[in-house]
């Protein structure tokens, strides 16, 4: 029953999320991974010649794009399909992890609570964050599946080994997993070992499972680092420096804290402040009356409040051997946010992509922690009233999701120029980052625009999300330039 129901829900959610994703135009950030997946699909498994951003997604979303392109080819819609598929699976994985070992009605409530919190991304910036190009969200999917294994599987020797393999695989593509999974797992397990030794006089041998998980977490970083260096030694992709590793000035921390809180509200759909201020950087109304949009965002505060409640309750189980996953998730939120706030990338709400794991982790904690606490309420009528309120809130979430999915799809600004370029036999040119890779993806590779940086006297190759052979005059030739309105999102035009 659970399998059939999950498959049905997954199919419905995928098409709804696909519609919602299409309401936010694709950008070059997503096109980068689409082109890398296309290159990988055509045999360049190590992405030789590529210079990639500080987060490569080499083992997460890039293979996902390759699989999609295997069946569909290189198309403009690949970004939306990948985003919808990832988020659909993430919602279901969060629900299953929140369910734990519960069955029947209790299991359904836990599943619905976690999935319900995530089910309706806020129309606008949150849609872009959760349903568009890779932004660390896809990293959370294999991590949730690993936590599901730790939650359900017996304590056998091969479980830490499997966890180490998953962590290594994910860290290769996204080092944020060190903050959200590997580090927290090592901290919680090490603390439990130390507590058991000091409090209960337990030997290290009797705690082999926890020690094995600590070792798996630590070794996953070493194995991932070794793998990345091996790829480099084999002339695979190169990585640009990590911008987020730099710290912000101390006087900017209050603004960073404010932006972090705003980003978390936004990813939970509870960003009514930017709606009420009519900010272009926050949620969009899409024709919805302002009062309704603010009220709907305020309702999402219910989900955020439940996640916060579950987050704090999870620390009660920090040393409880019956529940390993909950304190690890809560610790992951703490470490991720603590590393994010003082960094240079936390100045604006849309930078919350660096802490996007807070959404699925918080939703899971709400599902695992809150129903048990509510079940202990003494009065039956109070429980019934809360159940009706919960159903009503979920209905409002679904109504908001349906409204967002019903909006008109938005084509990116570069699609309109492609037919004109092809009609004039202009198929190899130069452009800046916002349009270059996006045009290549939109055209299915028929039009090649190569990213450059314009200096006062010439153009130079831009070694960022680009491939070295594009700039080899023996293989490439450019006879026109694509520009747009200050390269800030206007419609593109070509200059031969």
Describe the predicted segments one by one:
Residues 55, 423-460:
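Short periplasmic/luminal acceptor-recognition loop of GT-C membrane glycosyltransferases, typified by
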Residues 7-10, 81-107, 145, 305-308:
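Transmembrane-helix motifs of polytopic, lipid-linked glycan transferases
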Residues 54, 58, 104-151, 350-362, ...:
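Membrane-interface micro-motifs in multi-pass membrane enzymes
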Residues 2-8, 215, 219, 329, ...:
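Signature aromatic-anchored transmembrane alpha helix within multi-pass, membrane-resident enzymes
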Residues 158-184:
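Membrane-interface alpha helices of multi-pass inner-membrane proteins
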Residues 134-142, 179-180, 288-305, 322-378:
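Hydrophobic/aromatic-rich transmembrane helices and adjacent perimembrane loops
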Residues 32-38, 51-74, 263-283:
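Short hydrophobic/aromatic helix or loop-helix immediately within or flanking a transmembrane segment
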Residues 105-108, 193-212, 282-333:
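Membrane-interface helix-loop-helix junctions at transmembrane boundaries of multi-pass membrane enzymes
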């Amino acid at each position: 029953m659970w399998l059939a129901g999950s498959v049905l829900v997954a199919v419905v959610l995928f098409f709804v999320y696909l519609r919602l994703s299409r309401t936010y135009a694709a950008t070059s950030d997503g096109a980068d991974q689409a082109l890398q997946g296309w290159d990988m699909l055509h045999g360049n498994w190590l992405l030789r010649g590529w210079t990639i951003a500080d987060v490569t997604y080499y083992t997460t979303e890039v293979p996902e794009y390759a699989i999609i392109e295997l069946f569909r080819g290189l198309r403009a819609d690949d970004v939306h399909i990948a985003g919808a598929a990832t988020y659909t699976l993430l919602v279901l994985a969060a629900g299953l992890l929140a369910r734990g070992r519960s069955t029947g009605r209790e299991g359904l409530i836990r599943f619905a609570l976690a999935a319900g919190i995530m089910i309706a991304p806020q129309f606008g910036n949150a849609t872009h964050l959760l349903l568009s190009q890779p932004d660390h969200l896809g990293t959370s999917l294999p991590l949730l599946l690993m936590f599901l294994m730790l939650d359900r599987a017996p304590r056998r020797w091969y479980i830490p080994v499997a966890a180490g393999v998953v962590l290594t695989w994910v860290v290769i593509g996204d080092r944020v997993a060190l903050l959200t999974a590997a580090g927290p797992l090592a901290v919680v397990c090490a603390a439990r070992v130390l507590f058991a030794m000091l409090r209960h006089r337990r030997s290290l041998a009797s705690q082999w499972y926890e020690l094995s998980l600590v070792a798996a977490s630590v070794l996953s970083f070493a194995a991932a680092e070794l793998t990345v260096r091996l790829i480099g030694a084999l002339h695979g992709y190169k990585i640009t420096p990590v911008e987020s590793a730099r710290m912000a000035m101390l006087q900017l921390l209050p603004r960073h804290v404010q932006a972090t809180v705003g980003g978390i509200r936004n990813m939970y759909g509870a960003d009514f402040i930017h709606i009420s201020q009519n900010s272009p950087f926050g949620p969009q109304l899409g024709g919805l009356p302002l009062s309704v949009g603010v009220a709907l965002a305020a309702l999402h505060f219910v989900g955020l409040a439940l996640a916060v409640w579950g987050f704090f309750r999870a620390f009660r189980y920090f040393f409880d051997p019956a529940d390993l996953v909950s304190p690890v998730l809560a610790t992951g939120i703490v470490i991720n946010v603590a590393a994010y706030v003082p960094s240079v990338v936390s100045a604006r709400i849309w930078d919350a992509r660096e802490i996007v794991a807070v959404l699925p982790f918080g939703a899971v904690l709400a599902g695992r922690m809150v129903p048990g606490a509510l079940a202990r309420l003494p009065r039956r009528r109070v429980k019934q009233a809360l159940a009706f309120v919960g159903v009503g809130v979920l209905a409002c979430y679904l109504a908001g999701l349906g409204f967002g999915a019903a909006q008109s799809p938005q084509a990116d600004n570069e699609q309109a120029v492609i037919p004109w370029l092809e009609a004039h036999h202009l198929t190899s040119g130069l452009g800046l980052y916002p349009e270059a890779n996006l045009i290549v993806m939109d055209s299915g590779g028929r039009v090649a625009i190569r990213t450059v940086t314009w200096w006062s006297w010439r153009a130079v190759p831009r070694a960022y999300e680009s491939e070295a052979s594009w700039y080899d005059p023996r293989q490439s030739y450019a006879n026109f330039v694509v520009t747009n309105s200050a390269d800030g999102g206007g419609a593109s035009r070509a200059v031969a």
